[in-house]
C-alpha cells in the first residue's frame, strides 16, 4: 500500500511542477509588435556604451558566445531573459545601468511590455545587498553583447 501512496504523491507533485513551468512559458512576452528601429537606436546611443563600461578590463575573447537568436523578437526574448532572470553564479543584472535602460526601451517601444513585467519585477525584489561582479556575470554580459549585435544586423528578419 505504501508504494502506491508514495507514487500518487509524487505524480501530483510532478504535475504541479509541470503546470507551473508551463505557466511561466505562457507568461513570456511576445516581442513581435515592438518598434525595432527605436530599440536599435536606444541600444546604439546608450545601452551599448553601458555594456562596454561593465565589461571594461575584460578581453573580448575571454568568453564564447553560446546564446544565439534567429530574428529580432527572438533576440529580444533572449536579451530579456539573460538580463532579468538570475542564473547560477550571477544573481541578477537587473540593477545595472544597461539593464535599466534596456527595460526602459522595451517598456517604451514594446506595447504592453511594462504591464507583463510587473509580477516578474516584484518577484525579483530579494537581491544581494553588495555588488559583486563575478566571472559568470561577465560571461552573461558578453552573451548580451553578442545578442545585441545580432539584433542590430540589417538583414536580420523582423519575425
From Swiss-Prot:
One of its GO terms (biological process) is positive regulation of interleukin-6 production. Disulfide bonds join 34-110, 69-75, 90-137. Induction: Released by primary epithelial cells in response to certain microbial products, physical injury, or inflammatory cytokines. InterPro entries: TSLP, TSLP_sf. GO terms for molecular function: cytokine activity; interleukin-7 receptor binding. Residues 1-28 form the signal peptide. Glycans are attached at residues 64, 119. Pfam families: TSLP (PF15216). One of its GO terms (cellular component) is extracellular space. It is found in: Secreted. Isoform 1 is expressed in a number of tissues including heart, liver and prostate. Isoform 2 is the predominant form in keratinocytes of oral mucosa, skin and in salivary glands. It is secreted into saliva. Keywords: Cytokine, Disulfide bond, Glycoprotein, Secreted, Signal. Interacts with a receptor composed of CRLF2 and IL7R. Binding of TSLP to CRLF2/TSLPR is a mechanistic prerequisite for recruitment of IL7R to the high-affinity ternary complex. This is Thymic stromal lymphopoietin. It comes from Homo sapiens (Human).
